[in-house]
């Protein structure tokens, strides 16, 4: 008999995870604040829920794919939260990007209610989520992995087991976000210089993606700039948050991160200028004196 799996948050990553779970044959329940997204989920064969509590009462495993620690707190422990409705021995897979200390405390709080947890941030983007090929950075007790094994196999191409202590997965995720944010900022700076110097941007993209200066983020994000399409898959404000979290972690350890600080300021400038809800590649819009490619009509 197929297990009941819950997904809280049907954003770019969450909807793809739900699709992968449906494809694997699970009974998938989900909740989201947007009725149109829940309808699309229902049309795909899923079971919409009115609240996290309703979802938690139905499911053996609950995945939280929300934006941050505050949303994780709300969907698990707020009004109509999932945790109080779940049966002891069930599992929460917490996949938001959160401070490591929050992940540690979350594991303790869930354990007090008799629930297991995996600290399990994700990476790879919406396309990999939809194809079941995400990367997951996980940590937690062996019993949690036993309950999660078939779920993880359905949604991830690579699952890293980083120890039994909650927080280890989140530490690795924020280091990944350090690199991701710096690489996006560097890609924007490089393209901005090219535009300022009159280099054809399409030619520049082709050269860099076949040269040593390339990065995954350059190759993935610069096409958004070339098309003039800043429809958000991951927004500027995500990196305001995530690089802020990186810097807070380093500050706690009294550890300098000069590149991260510079990149964070770039995303802050873009957000302050009104681009916070746009795709993170819109960080290029902070540079003066350049004409960006326009979106084709």
UniProtKB/Swiss-Prot annotation:
Keywords of the record: Carbohydrate metabolism, NAD, NADP, Oxidoreductase
Active site: 173
Cross-referenced Gene3D superfamilies: N-(1-d-carboxylethyl)-l-norvaline Dehydrogenase, domain 2, NAD(P)-binding Rossmann-like Domain
S-S pairs: none
Pfam families: NAD_binding_11 (PF14833), NAD_binding_2 (PF03446)
Single biological process term from Gene Ontology: organic acid catabolic process
Annotated residues for binding of NAD(+): 3-31, 97, 241
Keyword Nucleus attached: no
EC number: 1.1.1.411
GO molecular function, one term: oxidoreductase activity, acting on the CH-OH group of donors, NAD or NADP as acceptor
InterPro entries, per the entry: 6-PGluconate_DH-like_C_sf, 6PGD_dom2, 6PGDH_NADP-bd, HIBADH-like_NADP-bd, HIBADH-related, LtnD, NAD(P)-bd_dom_sf
Protein origin, superkingdom: Bacteria
Reactions catalysed: L-threonate + NAD(+) = 2-dehydro-L-erythronate + NADH + H(+)
Phenotype reported upon loss of the gene: Deletion mutant is unable to use L-threonate as a carbon source.
PANTHER family: 3-HYDROXYISOBUTYRATE DEHYDROGENASE-LIKE 1, MITOCHONDRIAL-RELATED, L-THREONATE DEHYDROGENASE
Cited NCBIfam families: ThreonDh
UniProt record similarity statement: Belongs to the HIBADH-related family. L-threonate dehydrogenase subfamily.
Role this protein plays: Catalyzes oxidation of L-threonate to 2-oxo-tetronate. Can use either NAD(+) or NADP(+) as cosubstrate, with a preference for NAD(+).
This protein's name: L-threonate dehydrogenase
Organism whose genome encodes this protein: Cupriavidus necator (strain ATCC 17699 / DSM 428 / KCTC 22496 / NCIMB 10442 / H16 / Stanier 337) (Ralstonia eutropha)
Taxon lineage: Bacteria, Pseudomonadati, Pseudomonadota, Betaproteobacteria, Burkholderiales
């Amino acid at each position: 008999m197929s297990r009941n799996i819950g997904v809280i948050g049907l954003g770019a990553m969450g909807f793809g995870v739900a699709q992968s779970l449906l494809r694997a044959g699970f009974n998938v329940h989900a909740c989201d604040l947007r009725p149109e997204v829940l309808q699309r989920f229902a049309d795909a064969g899923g079971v919409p829920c009115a609240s996290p509590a309703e979802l938690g009462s139905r499911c053996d495993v609950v995945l939280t794919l929300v934006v941050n620690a505050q949303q994780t707190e709300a969907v698990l422990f707020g009004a109509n939260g999932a945790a109080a409705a779940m049966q002891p021995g069930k599992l929460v897979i917490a996949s938001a990007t959160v401070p490591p200390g929050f992940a540690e405390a979350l594991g303790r709080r869930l354990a007090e209610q008799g629930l297991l947890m995996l600290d399990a941030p994700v990476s790879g983007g919406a396309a990999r989520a939809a194809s079941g090929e995400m990367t997951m950075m996980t940590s937690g007790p062996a019993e949690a992995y036993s309950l999660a094994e078939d779920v993880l196999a359905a949604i991830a191409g690579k699952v890293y087991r980083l120890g039994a202590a909650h927080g280890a997965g989140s530490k690795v995720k924020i280091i990944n976000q350090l690199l991701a944010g710096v690489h996006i900022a560097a890609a924007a700076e490089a393209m901005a210089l090219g535009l300022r110097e009159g280099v054809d941007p399409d030619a520049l993209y082709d050269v860099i993606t076949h040269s040593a200066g390339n990065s995954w983020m350059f190759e993935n994000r610069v096409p958004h700039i070339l098309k003039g399409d800043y429809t958000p898959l991951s927004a500027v404000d995500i990196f305001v948050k995530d690089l802020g979290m990186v810097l807070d972690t380093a500050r706690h350890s009294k550890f300098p991160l000069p590149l991260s600080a510079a990149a964070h300021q770039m995303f802050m400038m873009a957000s302050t200028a009104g681009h916070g809800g746009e795709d993170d590649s819109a960080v290029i819009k902070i540079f003066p004196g350049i004409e960006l490619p326009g979106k084709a009509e």
